[in-house]
Amino acid sequence: MFRSMLVRSSASAKQAVIRRSFSSGSVPERKVAILGAAGGIGQPLALLMKLNPLVSSLSLYDIANTPGVAADVGHINTRSEVVGYMGDDNLAKALEGADLVIIPAGVPRKPGMTRDDLFNINAGIVKNLCTAIAKYCPHALINMISNPVNSTVPIAAEIFKKAGMYDEKKLFGVTTLDVVRARTFYAGKANVPVAEVNVPVIGGHAGVTILPLFSQATPQANLSSDILTALTKRTQDGGTEVVEAKAGKGSATLSMAYAGALFADACLKGLNGVPDVIECSYVQSTITELPFFASKVRLGKNGVEEVLDLGPLSDFEKEGLEALKPELKSSIEKGVKFANQ
Protein backbone atom coordinates (compact mmCIF):
# COMPACT_ATOMS: atom_id res chain seq x y z
CA MET A 1 0.00 0.00 0.00
CA PHE A 2 1.00 3.59 -0.41
CA ARG A 3 2.54 5.26 2.58
CA SER A 4 2.84 9.03 2.78
CA MET A 5 5.41 10.61 5.01
CA LEU A 6 5.70 14.30 5.71
CA VAL A 7 9.30 15.35 6.36
CA ARG A 8 9.82 18.82 7.83
CA SER A 9 13.15 20.60 8.06
CA SER A 10 13.71 22.59 11.26
CA ALA A 11 17.03 24.05 10.12
CA SER A 12 15.56 26.14 7.33
CA ALA A 13 12.21 27.57 6.38
CA LYS A 14 9.40 25.12 6.91
CA GLN A 15 9.26 22.91 3.86
CA ALA A 16 7.34 19.72 3.31
CA VAL A 17 8.31 16.87 1.06
CA ILE A 18 5.80 14.12 0.46
CA ARG A 19 7.55 10.83 -0.01
CA ARG A 20 5.48 8.03 -1.39
CA SER A 21 6.67 4.48 -1.40
CA PHE A 22 5.16 1.06 -1.94
CA SER A 23 7.40 -1.74 -0.83
CA SER A 24 10.80 -2.17 0.67
CA GLY A 25 13.28 -4.96 1.17
CA SER A 26 15.03 -6.86 -1.60
CA VAL A 27 14.86 -5.11 -4.92
CA PRO A 28 15.78 -7.33 -7.87
CA GLU A 29 15.73 -5.91 -11.38
CA ARG A 30 12.14 -5.71 -12.64
CA LYS A 31 10.98 -4.28 -15.95
CA VAL A 32 7.40 -3.03 -16.09
CA ALA A 33 5.76 -2.11 -19.39
CA ILE A 34 2.64 0.06 -19.61
CA LEU A 35 0.72 -0.23 -22.88
CA GLY A 36 -1.43 2.85 -23.35
CA ALA A 37 0.90 5.00 -21.26
CA ALA A 38 -0.11 8.33 -22.81
CA GLY A 39 -3.81 7.96 -22.02
CA GLY A 40 -5.99 9.15 -19.18
CA ILE A 41 -5.16 6.14 -17.00
CA GLY A 42 -1.72 5.52 -18.46
CA GLN A 43 -0.16 8.84 -17.50
CA PRO A 44 -0.99 8.82 -13.77
CA LEU A 45 -0.24 5.09 -13.71
CA ALA A 46 3.19 5.79 -15.20
CA LEU A 47 3.78 8.37 -12.48
CA LEU A 48 2.78 5.98 -9.71
CA MET A 49 4.91 3.14 -11.10
CA LYS A 50 7.87 5.54 -11.33
CA LEU A 51 7.49 6.02 -7.58
CA ASN A 52 7.61 2.28 -6.92
CA PRO A 53 11.09 1.22 -5.78
CA LEU A 54 10.51 -2.34 -6.98
CA VAL A 55 10.62 -1.13 -10.59
CA SER A 56 14.08 -0.84 -12.15
CA SER A 57 12.99 -0.28 -15.76
CA LEU A 58 9.76 1.46 -16.78
CA SER A 59 8.77 1.00 -20.42
CA LEU A 60 6.03 3.34 -21.65
CA TYR A 61 4.23 2.52 -24.91
CA ASP A 62 1.43 4.16 -26.85
CA ILE A 63 0.53 5.00 -30.43
CA ALA A 64 1.26 8.71 -29.87
CA ASN A 65 2.71 11.20 -27.37
CA THR A 66 4.76 8.67 -25.42
CA PRO A 67 8.14 10.46 -25.69
CA GLY A 68 6.73 13.47 -23.86
CA VAL A 69 5.24 11.39 -21.07
CA ALA A 70 8.50 9.46 -20.71
CA ALA A 71 10.58 12.65 -20.61
CA ASP A 72 8.31 14.18 -17.98
CA VAL A 73 8.13 11.12 -15.73
CA GLY A 74 11.79 10.33 -16.34
CA HIS A 75 12.92 13.48 -14.53
CA ILE A 76 11.62 12.12 -11.23
CA ASN A 77 14.54 11.08 -9.03
CA THR A 78 13.54 7.52 -8.23
CA ARG A 79 15.16 4.20 -9.02
CA SER A 80 13.68 3.23 -12.37
CA GLU A 81 14.96 4.21 -15.78
CA VAL A 82 12.19 5.33 -18.14
CA VAL A 83 12.03 4.81 -21.90
CA GLY A 84 9.12 5.84 -24.11
CA TYR A 85 8.16 3.91 -27.24
CA MET A 86 5.69 5.07 -29.87
CA GLY A 87 3.97 3.25 -32.72
CA ASP A 88 3.70 -0.35 -33.88
CA ASP A 89 7.33 -0.52 -34.99
CA ASN A 90 8.53 -0.01 -31.42
CA LEU A 91 6.14 -2.33 -29.59
CA ALA A 92 8.63 -5.20 -29.58
CA LYS A 93 11.30 -3.05 -27.90
CA ALA A 94 8.80 -1.89 -25.32
CA LEU A 95 7.92 -5.46 -24.39
CA GLU A 96 11.21 -7.35 -24.57
CA GLY A 97 12.38 -8.47 -21.14
CA ALA A 98 9.27 -7.28 -19.31
CA ASP A 99 8.40 -9.01 -16.04
CA LEU A 100 5.03 -7.28 -15.79
CA VAL A 101 2.85 -5.77 -18.53
CA ILE A 102 0.01 -3.45 -17.56
CA ILE A 103 -2.61 -2.75 -20.24
CA PRO A 104 -4.78 0.37 -19.81
CA ALA A 105 -4.89 0.89 -23.60
CA GLY A 106 -8.14 1.67 -25.37
CA VAL A 107 -10.91 4.23 -25.28
CA PRO A 108 -12.58 5.31 -22.02
CA ARG A 109 -16.27 4.99 -21.36
CA LYS A 110 -18.35 8.06 -22.17
CA PRO A 111 -21.95 9.00 -21.32
CA GLY A 112 -24.38 7.09 -23.49
CA MET A 113 -21.77 4.57 -24.60
CA THR A 114 -22.97 0.99 -24.44
CA ARG A 115 -20.79 -1.95 -23.47
CA ASP A 116 -20.99 -3.10 -27.08
CA ASP A 117 -19.58 0.25 -28.21
CA LEU A 118 -16.68 -0.13 -25.81
CA PHE A 119 -16.13 -3.76 -26.73
CA ASN A 120 -16.04 -3.12 -30.46
CA ILE A 121 -13.11 -0.71 -30.10
CA ASN A 122 -11.10 -2.10 -27.22
CA ALA A 123 -11.35 -5.80 -28.11
CA GLY A 124 -9.34 -5.27 -31.27
CA ILE A 125 -6.71 -3.24 -29.44
CA VAL A 126 -6.31 -5.92 -26.78
CA LYS A 127 -6.11 -8.66 -29.40
CA ASN A 128 -3.25 -6.92 -31.20
CA LEU A 129 -1.32 -6.12 -28.03
CA CYS A 130 -1.63 -9.65 -26.67
CA THR A 131 -0.42 -11.09 -29.97
CA ALA A 132 2.74 -9.03 -29.50
CA ILE A 133 3.07 -10.00 -25.83
CA ALA A 134 2.92 -13.69 -26.74
CA LYS A 135 5.82 -13.13 -29.12
CA TYR A 136 8.09 -10.75 -27.23
CA CYS A 137 7.54 -11.38 -23.49
CA PRO A 138 5.48 -14.58 -23.20
CA HIS A 139 6.44 -15.22 -19.57
CA ALA A 140 5.46 -11.81 -18.20
CA LEU A 141 2.58 -11.28 -15.80
CA ILE A 142 -0.28 -9.47 -17.56
CA ASN A 143 -2.47 -6.96 -15.73
CA MET A 144 -5.52 -6.22 -17.88
CA ILE A 145 -7.19 -2.86 -17.23
CA SER A 146 -8.74 -2.28 -20.67
CA ASN A 147 -12.51 -2.57 -20.46
CA PRO A 148 -14.70 -4.53 -20.65
CA VAL A 149 -12.40 -6.64 -18.47
CA ASN A 150 -15.03 -9.39 -18.28
CA SER A 151 -14.39 -9.93 -22.01
CA THR A 152 -10.84 -8.67 -22.60
CA VAL A 153 -9.28 -11.20 -20.23
CA PRO A 154 -10.88 -14.14 -22.10
CA ILE A 155 -9.72 -12.53 -25.37
CA ALA A 156 -6.16 -12.42 -24.04
CA ALA A 157 -6.36 -16.04 -22.90
CA GLU A 158 -7.48 -17.19 -26.34
CA ILE A 159 -4.73 -15.23 -28.10
CA PHE A 160 -2.09 -16.74 -25.82
CA LYS A 161 -3.53 -20.23 -26.38
CA LYS A 162 -3.26 -19.79 -30.14
CA ALA A 163 0.38 -18.81 -29.73
CA GLY A 164 1.03 -21.80 -27.46
CA MET A 165 2.04 -19.43 -24.68
CA TYR A 166 -0.93 -19.43 -22.31
CA ASP A 167 -0.21 -19.65 -18.60
CA GLU A 168 -3.41 -19.10 -16.65
CA LYS A 169 -1.39 -18.19 -13.57
CA LYS A 170 0.00 -15.09 -15.26
CA LEU A 171 -3.14 -13.42 -16.62
CA PHE A 172 -5.05 -11.03 -14.36
CA GLY A 173 -8.06 -8.82 -14.82
CA VAL A 174 -7.51 -5.82 -12.55
CA THR A 175 -10.61 -5.45 -10.37
CA THR A 176 -8.82 -3.57 -7.60
CA LEU A 177 -10.82 -0.40 -8.19
CA ASP A 178 -13.96 -2.26 -7.10
CA VAL A 179 -12.17 -3.18 -3.87
CA VAL A 180 -10.93 0.38 -3.38
CA ARG A 181 -14.44 1.76 -3.83
CA ALA A 182 -16.01 -0.86 -1.57
CA ARG A 183 -13.50 0.00 1.16
CA THR A 184 -14.11 3.73 0.82
CA PHE A 185 -17.90 3.52 0.77
CA TYR A 186 -18.02 1.00 3.63
CA ALA A 187 -15.70 3.07 5.83
CA GLY A 188 -17.97 6.08 5.38
CA LYS A 189 -21.07 4.24 6.51
CA ALA A 190 -19.39 2.20 9.24
CA ASN A 191 -17.57 5.27 10.58
CA VAL A 192 -14.23 3.44 10.75
CA PRO A 193 -10.79 4.51 9.43
CA VAL A 194 -10.65 3.58 5.76
CA ALA A 195 -7.02 2.46 6.06
CA GLU A 196 -8.16 -0.35 8.37
CA VAL A 197 -10.93 -1.59 6.07
CA ASN A 198 -10.81 -4.64 3.84
CA VAL A 199 -13.70 -5.85 1.68
CA PRO A 200 -13.39 -8.77 -0.76
CA VAL A 201 -15.09 -8.19 -4.11
CA ILE A 202 -15.94 -11.15 -6.33
CA GLY A 203 -17.56 -11.86 -9.70
CA GLY A 204 -16.56 -9.58 -12.54
CA HIS A 205 -15.77 -5.97 -13.27
CA ALA A 206 -18.96 -4.41 -14.63
CA GLY A 207 -22.32 -3.49 -13.13
CA VAL A 208 -24.17 -6.35 -11.46
CA THR A 209 -21.22 -8.71 -11.97
CA ILE A 210 -19.41 -6.74 -9.25
CA LEU A 211 -20.30 -8.31 -5.89
CA PRO A 212 -18.71 -6.84 -2.75
CA LEU A 213 -18.83 -9.23 0.20
CA PHE A 214 -19.65 -6.80 2.97
CA SER A 215 -20.50 -9.73 5.25
CA GLN A 216 -16.75 -10.46 5.26
CA ALA A 217 -15.68 -6.82 5.67
CA THR A 218 -13.24 -5.96 8.42
CA PRO A 219 -13.63 -4.35 10.84
CA GLN A 220 -17.20 -5.59 11.15
CA ALA A 221 -19.97 -3.05 11.64
CA ASN A 222 -23.63 -3.57 12.39
CA LEU A 223 -25.11 -2.04 9.23
CA SER A 224 -28.73 -2.50 8.19
CA SER A 225 -29.69 -4.55 5.17
CA ASP A 226 -30.86 -1.37 3.43
CA ILE A 227 -27.45 0.24 3.90
CA LEU A 228 -25.64 -2.88 2.68
CA THR A 229 -27.87 -3.01 -0.39
CA ALA A 230 -27.15 0.65 -1.10
CA LEU A 231 -23.40 0.11 -0.61
CA THR A 232 -23.48 -2.80 -3.04
CA LYS A 233 -25.35 -0.75 -5.62
CA ARG A 234 -22.97 2.19 -5.27
CA THR A 235 -19.94 -0.07 -5.66
CA GLN A 236 -21.47 -1.58 -8.79
CA ASP A 237 -22.26 1.86 -10.21
CA GLY A 238 -19.02 3.54 -9.15
CA GLY A 239 -17.75 3.91 -12.70
CA THR A 240 -20.99 5.48 -13.87
CA GLU A 241 -20.92 7.87 -10.92
CA VAL A 242 -17.55 9.23 -12.07
CA VAL A 243 -18.48 9.35 -15.77
CA GLU A 244 -21.58 11.39 -14.96
CA ALA A 245 -19.71 13.66 -12.54
CA LYS A 246 -17.14 14.44 -15.24
CA ALA A 247 -20.01 15.36 -17.58
CA GLY A 248 -18.65 13.73 -20.69
CA LYS A 249 -15.05 14.79 -20.13
CA GLY A 250 -13.62 11.54 -18.86
CA SER A 251 -14.02 8.41 -16.82
CA ALA A 252 -12.42 7.07 -13.64
CA THR A 253 -8.80 7.65 -14.64
CA LEU A 254 -7.11 8.75 -11.42
CA SER A 255 -8.71 6.22 -9.09
CA MET A 256 -8.14 3.50 -11.70
CA ALA A 257 -4.47 4.42 -11.97
CA TYR A 258 -4.19 4.25 -8.18
CA ALA A 259 -5.89 0.85 -8.10
CA GLY A 260 -3.76 -0.39 -10.99
CA ALA A 261 -0.61 0.68 -9.19
CA LEU A 262 -1.71 -1.10 -6.01
CA PHE A 263 -2.30 -4.36 -7.85
CA ALA A 264 0.91 -4.07 -9.86
CA ASP A 265 2.83 -3.58 -6.62
CA ALA A 266 1.22 -6.72 -5.20
CA CYS A 267 2.25 -8.67 -8.31
CA LEU A 268 5.83 -7.42 -8.00
CA LYS A 269 5.90 -8.37 -4.33
CA GLY A 270 4.73 -11.86 -5.28
CA LEU A 271 7.39 -12.16 -7.98
CA ASN A 272 10.01 -11.15 -5.44
CA GLY A 273 8.94 -13.86 -3.01
CA VAL A 274 7.10 -11.80 -0.41
CA PRO A 275 4.81 -14.28 1.40
CA ASP A 276 1.04 -14.07 1.84
CA VAL A 277 0.30 -11.45 -0.81
CA ILE A 278 -3.46 -11.73 -1.29
CA GLU A 279 -5.55 -9.55 -3.60
CA CYS A 280 -8.81 -9.84 -5.49
CA SER A 281 -8.47 -10.36 -9.24
CA TYR A 282 -10.40 -11.69 -12.24
CA VAL A 283 -8.60 -14.90 -13.23
CA GLN A 284 -9.13 -18.33 -14.71
CA SER A 285 -10.93 -20.16 -11.95
CA THR A 286 -12.75 -23.33 -10.95
CA ILE A 287 -14.46 -22.03 -7.81
CA THR A 288 -17.68 -21.55 -9.82
CA GLU A 289 -18.87 -23.10 -13.07
CA LEU A 290 -17.62 -20.01 -14.94
CA PRO A 291 -14.14 -20.23 -16.53
CA PHE A 292 -13.15 -16.76 -15.30
CA PHE A 293 -14.11 -15.24 -11.99
CA ALA A 294 -12.87 -12.54 -9.63
CA SER A 295 -12.02 -13.60 -6.10
CA LYS A 296 -9.16 -13.48 -3.64
CA VAL A 297 -5.93 -14.97 -5.00
CA ARG A 298 -2.57 -15.60 -3.41
CA LEU A 299 0.23 -14.11 -5.50
CA GLY A 300 3.72 -15.55 -5.78
CA LYS A 301 6.75 -16.08 -7.98
CA ASN A 302 4.65 -17.74 -10.68
CA GLY A 303 1.73 -15.32 -10.55
CA VAL A 304 -1.39 -16.97 -9.12
CA GLU A 305 -0.25 -19.42 -6.46
CA GLU A 306 -3.74 -20.17 -5.18
CA VAL A 307 -7.33 -19.15 -5.89
CA LEU A 308 -8.96 -18.86 -2.49
CA ASP A 309 -12.44 -20.08 -1.62
CA LEU A 310 -15.26 -17.55 -1.52
CA GLY A 311 -15.89 -18.13 2.17
CA PRO A 312 -19.29 -17.79 3.87
CA LEU A 313 -21.80 -15.59 2.04
CA SER A 314 -24.90 -13.87 3.35
CA ASP A 315 -28.25 -14.72 1.77
CA PHE A 316 -28.13 -11.38 -0.07
CA GLU A 317 -24.68 -12.20 -1.44
CA LYS A 318 -25.74 -15.71 -2.46
CA GLU A 319 -28.59 -14.18 -4.46
CA GLY A 320 -26.19 -11.66 -6.00
CA LEU A 321 -23.79 -14.44 -6.97
CA GLU A 322 -26.47 -16.35 -8.84
CA ALA A 323 -27.79 -13.15 -10.44
CA LEU A 324 -24.41 -12.13 -11.85
CA LYS A 325 -23.57 -15.47 -13.46
CA PRO A 326 -25.65 -15.18 -16.68
CA GLU A 327 -24.23 -11.76 -17.58
CA LEU A 328 -20.67 -12.74 -16.74
CA LYS A 329 -21.03 -15.96 -18.73
CA SER A 330 -22.27 -13.98 -21.73
CA SER A 331 -19.36 -11.53 -21.50
CA ILE A 332 -16.83 -14.36 -21.33
CA GLU A 333 -18.36 -16.11 -24.33
CA LYS A 334 -18.37 -12.86 -26.27
CA GLY A 335 -14.64 -12.44 -25.69
CA VAL A 336 -13.84 -16.02 -26.66
CA LYS A 337 -15.91 -15.72 -29.83
CA PHE A 338 -14.19 -12.47 -30.83
CA ALA A 339 -10.71 -13.92 -30.34
CA ASN A 340 -11.51 -16.92 -32.52
CA GLN A 341 -13.31 -15.26 -35.41
From Swiss-Prot:
GO terms for biological process: malate metabolic process; response to cold; tricarboxylic acid cycle. The keyword Transmembrane does not apply. NAD(+) binds at residues 36-42, 62, 122, 145-147, 256. One of its GO terms (molecular function) is L-malate dehydrogenase (NAD+) activity. Substrate binds at residues 109, 115, 147, 181. Residues 1-22 form a transit peptide. It is found in: Mitochondrion matrix. Negatively regulated by ATP. Not redox-regulated. The formation of intramolecular disulfide bonds does not alter enzymatic activity. Keywords: Disulfide bond, Mitochondrion, NAD, Oxidoreductase, Transit peptide, Tricarboxylic acid cycle. The active site is at 205 (proton acceptor). It catalyses: (S)-malate + NAD(+) = oxaloacetate + NADH + H(+). Its EC number is 1.1.1.37. Disruption phenotype: Slight reduction of rosette leaf size and reduction by 50 percents in fresh weight and seed production. The double mutant plants mmdh1 and mmdh2 have decreased germination rate, grow slowly, are small, have increased photorespiration and die before producing seeds. Forms intramolecular disulfide bonds. Belongs to the LDH/MDH superfamily. MDH type 1 family. Homodimer. This is Malate dehydrogenase 1, mitochondrial. It comes from Arabidopsis thaliana. The lineage of its organism: Eukaryota, Viridiplantae, Streptophyta, Embryophyta, Tracheophyta.
